[in-house]
Amino acid sequence: MKKNLFYFLLAALCTVSFTACSSDDNGDGENGGFTELEHIWSLEPTVMYDESGNVTTNPDDAVKYTGSVQVTWDCPEGTSLEWGEGENKMQLPVATIKQLVENMGNANLASVLKSVEFKSNGQIVAVYKDAATTSTANDGWKTASDYATYKKVNNNQILVFLNTAKVTEGMEADEKAALTEVLKIFKDGIPVNIRWSANNTKAYFYIDKAFVTSLLDNQTLKAMLDSLANTDAETNSTVIMIKAIVNSAKDVMNKTTKFEAGLELMQ
């Protein structure tokens, strides 16, 4: 199996853990028609802190980053996620995962994502760069449209629908086939929760525990992994690893009392 397939399968677990939330909605809703949402949304400023907890402007001194990427993960102290298999198996404490996600996300996201616009016709448009850069120049930014649309469920939730053909455009055949299978998991839309600030100029787009739990029990994902299990030795090893991560994650989520992960954006 191509190594990229492993990353696609793993990304199926990780990506939605930070881009969607749970819902029993059947996909009904209105395209656009969400005045509060129909704006261009930008990232929160990134703030760096040193070991003493003081704000710093020197990345070499930074040990903590805050900004748009925000995670709440409440579970018993010492709860860990198992990663890897055999001699390579290791325990990653939930507290460490939370801090890593926030630090890495807030340190790097602003260099590849400038803004997200929710248009009145239901289109989602992002301004992005292909690769991270430390340059503050305005060059290099691109506009991505037709990759996703949204429907309003209520004032605190939207459904996001991915355009599979556009997302997989230009990929090698095996990579395209693999990612297409992964995206079938989200064919009914990705429900995204929204928590508004008092004046609606900030919005926190997040997932919760219920969705992560439902994803880990997703029958399409299970069937896909089972179908790949005996393809060849490398594939089988990868499938075993992913199943182990899924099983460990189920145990962790059973112990979790509150989980929210997402992006806080501002007008």
Locate the predicted segments by residue:
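Tryptophan-anchored aromatic micro-motifs
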Residues: 32-89, 265
